[in-house]
């Protein structure tokens, strides 16, 4: 019996020992799944004792204690059943091959999944047009800083999945590996920050965490201004507007109104440039940098419209920083051929000073002056096509440095395999440009002028590397221009069809004609000759090709063909828009080939099968391409007009239309009816906005690092300063976060009501600011600042300085000094860690020392 008592005593002692070990572990309950930020430190209660770090009792320790106890008990020769219970018989041992299939594998992991996507309008909400971004690294760290899962986003979805996160674990998610031209996106309904905190659920649970990123060169707000060039007949010594702006949402949506005047809204323009300043232009490019917002326009040869003061090779630059045009000047003048216009553009075409008739302006069209303009993605280099010498020019936008040129390829590959050089080098005519991912895309055609064989008509797109100044050896895309495109004009009575099929270029006046029903004695006319005038890209990399009809620049509206005839001609152009699908392997499918339908509704009812003038723009993230067009309004009897159409790239439908001019009611003819009366189109998108801020948290272990499970601190006022001046303040939310955005940011109206957002005036790129937090404010009066920059990165860089506390103490204020990056460089790494003051007790035991021995 005494052994039993001793045994019970020993077992009880062991149990007490085990309980003391267990209760000695000071544990903390982590926030629930995805809500690590939703359990902030309560600022309204008494001072909080510092929360200890999580500690775990190793099962091995407890097992050792119990095992030793069992040995002791066994050594006493006692049956365990006498003390506690009768242990059941153990199950039969199973060999590997005899493991029952019905026993499921234990699932102990949870998942975090999501996408990293390109946020074109930087609103933190993903649209179905915003693609995934591949090659971004997403990593989960546990409380010890150990990687528990990592993945890299894949193309084309931008998806990642972290599959090995222990169930119930709190982790820190870091997003790294952003390319130089990619910046973290803004916070929003579909976007976290590059550092986030998640507590996963039980085994098999899945948490979703998405992140937006921004490519500043592709950013555009929802309703940017667009600009286009307009043409007026004759000498350009007038105040007629020849470059005008209009908002992206101009005009009306077909099917929503039968009032044609709805398609004229707005009828006024904020940005206008007059004819006497720039003359006739086609190519337009736009530069947006923190220092400048400027529009470039290149001189263009239209037979019935004169040049500006800079002549055939002029490139004009206009300040468009505000919503009205500023000063216009000549950036540079290229050698682009002689001006062959005469003294009178409408009737006699006489040259100066002899007064002899001029006939060679016809052939100069498409061969003199400049074609398209485009600009590098960094805004530092302007590209221009010289139609006279076939050169692609690189021009520094700041006016400094040399202007360099490279002749486009003229030894073009054969149209058919093995055909050799099917295009006479003298028939190679470049015109259109596009820029994407550092490469320049140059559009050109084989005009078949020397052979006059339509089978030789061909389109080519070559890539050019501006760094190495080399063209690719083979075209990125080429295809024959042999489609049956219907009729430029048709009617049933009398049966008439002016063919829209592309024709070889011709050096003298040539036309298909039909009597005009509206103007007796005058002739409707067309003779489509292709110029590949513009290249745009869809979000998936597919190319959109704008073809301009040379005939529309050779013949005017109700104008004679030459000084030797009184017959008046009304030109009807036969331009086109084609879609070359991305093939998924870095190439493009021929427009209209299998799997790449071309169904743009670029017609005017049954009268005209083609209405495009070739100039166009596509704003990233938008489903439409905006293209210049004659008779743009799809309503009856809206003819002899010029304007723009918005074509849906998936359906080909006309999503929107806007009329800029009508030649119907002009007392003196100034515009071009159904001819080429408009040039290129460009979007004047703003600079990508900037958002800064992020998190104040309780640094429980004092290491200056944001560890998973450490609590956020809400209710803290944060101030933004620049040059010692207060710009605004925000108050941290329950998740400890704060943010600042500029009042010009398009998302600012939706953020003004959120207390953790400070909407300020003056948050811009490449400037120095300070985040300040008064440490004496009530919300954090019992806290001190934790160690700063413990990762040895004090740059406050938005891609590298991610997880430590960045503030230093200046007096009684926590201060983070930082510089904003370029446009779109959102910075969510400006974090502040706080330590709670330890509560200290003083004193010891007071007792009556009866024997006076001090013990």
Predicted regions located by residue number:
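A short, Gly/Thr-enriched small/hydrophobic beta-strand-prone motif that recurs across taxa
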Residues: 104-125, 687-705, 717, 829-831, ...
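Extracellular beta-sheet/turn segments enriched in Thr/Pro/Gly and aliphatic residues
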Residues: 96, 102-108, 190-216, 792-838
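A short, solvent-exposed beta-strand micro-motif common in secreted/extracellular proteins
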Residues: 137-140, 167-188, 747-780
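Beta-strand signatures of extracellular beta-sandwich domains
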Residues: 115, 137-141, 174, 695, ...
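Short, acidic Ser/Thr/Gly-rich low-complexity loop/linker segments typical of extracellular
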Residues: 120-128, 132, 142-164, 704-707, ...
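Alpha-helical transmembrane segments
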Residues: 12-24
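Feature marks short, highly hydrophobic, charge-poor N-terminal signal-anchor/signal peptide-like helices
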Residues: 1-8
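Sequence/structural signature of beta-propeller domains
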Residues: 158, 177-689
């Amino acid at each position: 019996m005494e052994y039993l008592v001793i045994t019970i005593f020993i077992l009880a002692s062991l149990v007490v020992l085990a309980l003391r070990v267990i209760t000695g572990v000071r544990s903390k309950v982590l926030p629930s799944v995805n809500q690590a930020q939703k359990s902030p430190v309560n600022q309204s209660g008494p001072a909080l004792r510092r929360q200890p770090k999580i500690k775990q009792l190793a099962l091995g320790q407890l097992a050792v204690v119990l095992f030793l106890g069992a040995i002791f008990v066994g050594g006493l020769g006692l049956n365990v059943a006498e003390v506690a219970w009768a242990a059941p018989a153990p199950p039969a041992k199973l060999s590997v091959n005899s493991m029952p299939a019905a026993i499921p594998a234990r699932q102990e992991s949870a998942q975090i999944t999501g996408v990293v996507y390109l946020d074109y309008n930087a609103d933190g909400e993903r649209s179905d047009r915003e693609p995934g971004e591949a090659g971004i690294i997403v990593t989960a760290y546990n409380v010890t800083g150990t990687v528990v899962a990592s993945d890299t986003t894949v193309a084309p979805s931008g998806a990642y999945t972290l599959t090995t996160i222990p169930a119930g674990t709190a982790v820190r998610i870091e997003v790294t590996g952003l390319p130089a031209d990619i910046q973290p996106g803004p916070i929003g309904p579909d976007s976290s920050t590059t550092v986030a905190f998640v507590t996963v659920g039980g085994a098999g649970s899945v948490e979703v965490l998405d992140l937006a990123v921004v490519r500043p060169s592709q950013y555009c707000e929802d309703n940017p201004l667009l600009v286009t060039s307009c043409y007026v007949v004759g000498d350009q010594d007038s105040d007629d507007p020849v470059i005008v702006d209009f908002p992206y949402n101009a005009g009306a949506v077909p099917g929503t109104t039968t009032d044609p005047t709805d398609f004229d809204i707005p009828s006024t323009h904020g940005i206008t440039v007059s004819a006497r300043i720039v003359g006739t232009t086609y190519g337009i490019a736009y530069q947006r940098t923190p220092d400048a917002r400027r529009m470039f326009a290149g001189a263009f040869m239209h037979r019935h419209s004169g040049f500006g003061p800079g002549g055939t090779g002029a490139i004009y630059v206009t300040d468009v920083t505000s919503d009205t045009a500023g000063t216009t000047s000549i950036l540079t003048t290229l050698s682009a051929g002689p001006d062959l216009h005469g003294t009178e553009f409408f009737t006699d075409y006489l040259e100066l000073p002899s007064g002899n008739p001029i006939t060679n302006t016809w052939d100069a069209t498409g061969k003199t002056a400049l074609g398209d303009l485009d600009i590098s993605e960094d805004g530092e280099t302007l590209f221009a096509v010289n139609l006279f010498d076939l050169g692609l020019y690189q021009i520094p936008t700041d006016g400094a440095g040399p202007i360099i040129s490279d002749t486009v390829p003229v030894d073009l590959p054969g149209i058919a395999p093995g055909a050799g050089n099917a295009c006479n080098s003298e028939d190679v005519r470049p015109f259109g440009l596009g820029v994407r991912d550092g490469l320049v895309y140059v559009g050109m055609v084989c005009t078949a002028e020397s052979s006059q064989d339509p089978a030789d008509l061909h389109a080519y797109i070559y890539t050019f590397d501006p760094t190495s100044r080399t063209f690719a050896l083979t075209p990125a895309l080429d295809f024959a221009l042999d489609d049956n495109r219907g009729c430029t004009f048709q009617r049933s009575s009398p049966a008439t069809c002016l063919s829209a099929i592309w024709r070889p270029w011709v050096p003298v006046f040539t036309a298909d004609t039909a009597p005009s029903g509206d103007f007796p004695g005058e002739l409707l006319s067309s003779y489509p000759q292709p110029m590949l005038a513009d290249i745009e890209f869809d979000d998936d990399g597919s190319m959109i090709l704008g073809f301009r009809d040379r005939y529309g620049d050779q013949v005017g509206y109700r104008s004679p063909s030459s000084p030797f005839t009184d017959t008046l001609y009304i030109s009807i152009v036969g331009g086109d828009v084609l879609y070359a699908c991305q093939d998924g392997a870095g190439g493009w499918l021929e427009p209209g080939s299998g799997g790449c339908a071309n169904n743009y509704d670029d017609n005017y009812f049954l009268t005209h099968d083609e209405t495009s003038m070739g100039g166009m723009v596509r704003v990233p993230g938008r489903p439409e391409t905006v293209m210049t067009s004659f008779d743009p309004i799809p309503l009856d009897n809206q003819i002899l007009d010029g304007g723009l159409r918005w074509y849906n790239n998936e359906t080909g439908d006309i999503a929107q239309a806007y009329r800029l001019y009508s030649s119907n009611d002009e007392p003196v003819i100034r515009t071009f009816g159904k001819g080429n009366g408009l040039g290129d189109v460009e979007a004047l998108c703003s600079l990508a906005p900037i958002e800064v801020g992020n998190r104040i948290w309780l640094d429980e272990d004092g290491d200056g690092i944001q560890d998973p499970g450490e609590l956020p601190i809400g209710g803290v006022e944060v101030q933004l300063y620049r040059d010692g001046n207060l710009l605004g303040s925000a108050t941290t939310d329950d998740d400890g976060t704060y943010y600042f955005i500029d009042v010009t940011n398009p998302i600012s109206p939706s953020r003004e009501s959120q207390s953790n957002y400070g909407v300020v005036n003056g948050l811009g790129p490449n400037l120095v600011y300070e985040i300040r937090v008064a440490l004496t404010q009530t919300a954090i009066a019992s806290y001190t600042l934790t160690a700063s920059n413990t990762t040895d990165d004090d740059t406050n860089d938005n891609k590298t300085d991610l997880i430590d506390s960045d503030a230093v103490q200046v007096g009684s204020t926590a201060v983070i000094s930082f510089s904003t990056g370029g446009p779109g460089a959102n910075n969510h790494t400006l974090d502040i860690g706080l330590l709670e003051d330890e509560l200290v007790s003083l004193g010891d035991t007071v007792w009556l020392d009866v024997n006076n021995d001090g013990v």
